[in-house]
Design a protein with these regions (language model features):
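Short non-domain terminal segments
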Residues: 8, 22, 43, 54, ...
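Generic structural motif recognizing short loop/turn segments at the entrances and edges of beta-strands
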Residues: 18-20, 38, 60-62, 92-95, ...
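Surface-exposed, charged secondary-structure patches
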Residues: 27-89
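Histidine (H) residue identity feature
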Residues: 14, 54, 115-116
């Protein structure tokens, strides 16, 4: 499969970039902190036009689990907040990440409007 096309489809189906403004603060960013466009999000996930991007989605993750999941539904928004535990392949080092997702309904599906995640 073409990983670039898969990543584009993932972003289009999970993030609201095509219908409204999105705020995106990925987990492992230091130089360009926010990725508030589809092209910048794509660069974060598969590498591209931002030097620090090495492709979060291309890294071989063995396991990703969620702890302390909190969910809030108000008006037309749904919000999820918790901790992700990321375990790479061939490593015992687990990275804990605090995350917040704000979802909005677009064309009868939920999509991410705000994504913030930071290592703990």
């Amino acid at each position: 499969k073409d990983y670039k096309e898969c990543a584009k489809k993932f972003i289009e189906s999970h993030y609201a970039f095509d219908s409204e403004s999105v705020l995106f603060k990925p987990t492992f960013t230091k130089e360009v902190i926010f990725r508030n466009s589809k092209d910048m999000a794509l660069s974060y996930f598969i590498g591209g036009n931002i030097e620090e991007d090495h492709g979060f989605a291309l890294k071989p993750w063995e396991k990703i689990s969620i702890d302390e999941l909190n969910i809030l539904e108000e008006n037309k928004l749904s919000i999820a907040m918790g901790i992700l535990k990321l375990k790479p392949v061939n490593s015992d080092k687990i990275t804990s990440v605090a995350f917040t997702f704000v979802f909005t309904e677009t064309n009868s599906s939920l999509k991410i409007k705000v994504h913030h995640s930071s290592p703990l």
